[in-house]
Amino acid sequence: MADQLYLSLWYPNFRLESLPAALVGVLRQFALIAKDGQANSALGRVAAASVYPIDWTESPTYQRIYVNDDRAQTSEDTEGSIIENAVAEATEQLHDDMAYEFEMRWMLWLPDVSEGGLDTVWRLEPWRVKITGFGPQFDAGSFEQNGQIRVDFGLDTPWVLEDESLDEDGAERIKHNVEKLLAFTLSVEKHCGISSRLLWTESGEPLAEKLIARLQRLN
């Protein structure tokens, strides 16, 4: 059964004033992996930003959706969706009981279930990721469990399709997805000044070990 996949990040001696810079750092590392060498890719920009007060039951006090298109000329959206600009605008008013959420996209290999025939067709599809920074009082101080910054990868389907359902081509596609996930995780650990991190699932299954074991098998 599909499970929700997260990466929680904790920082040493963290202060609320440090949150915008920490968010920019994580978003930049994600953009580097998502762009995959494409200098002007829209995948390197923020797709949406939201600010939630108190806890997740409240409506956002700020929300902006960006229209990113590499073919479009420079516009208010393309300028605003640059990581530094999007974070600066959303965090202009920093409060310790708010969460600051930024959506980005990366391309992952997914099976196309709509295709007929016996052979599975794999396609690179955009996959949404949410990167959220938490004020220390948001949701009764849930940052202690979620991290000062939490990355929500969505459902774990692109990384944990069962081996028995995969042919050689499918195994290679899943391997690519796993490598991208691990590359981002290691990049954050190396460049973002964190004190600890945890890759976890909503069900509590130890997915990190499962992913590493899968990658070793595919190699």
What is each residue range found by the language model?
Residues 143-219:
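Acidic, proline/glycine-rich low-complexity IDRs
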